[in-house]
Amino acid sequence: MRVLGDKIGSTLLAQTADVSTMPWNGDGLTANLDENGNIPEEQFDAACIHSEDEAVEAAERIGYPVMLKASEGGGGKGIRKALDEAELRTAYPQVLGEVPGSPVFLVKLCVGARHLEVQVVGDTHGNAIALGGRDCSTQRRFQKIFEEG
């Protein structure tokens, strides 16, 4: 569950399981979980952006527009849209400053998408049930205004 609670870790795990993901700086990487169910540090680190120049290289590879995101961000903090290199270079220090110490990654912006959330409960026997979903697409500055269930 710890891996699924992290934006980079969950994307890396989904990609490893052949689940479709948006193009991102970690395309093509795989994760081999350790005996505790965690992604080894070196594999996680390979999926992170470590410099402004690395962010620009990744954006040029996947194509603009992109979202630069702090893995530990939330509530509109640590997320910036960049339509071109100049915006990305401006966004990089802002994202780092809003969520100090957080790993950072970059993902292709999906225009016109909906933000849907589903609550799932599972037990130790492999049983799981979806409790329902909600549309959280109405946002202001990347922060949910209301959730429609």
Predicted regions and their residues:
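N-terminal beta-alpha lobe that positions the nucleotide/phosphoryl donor
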Residues: 1-149
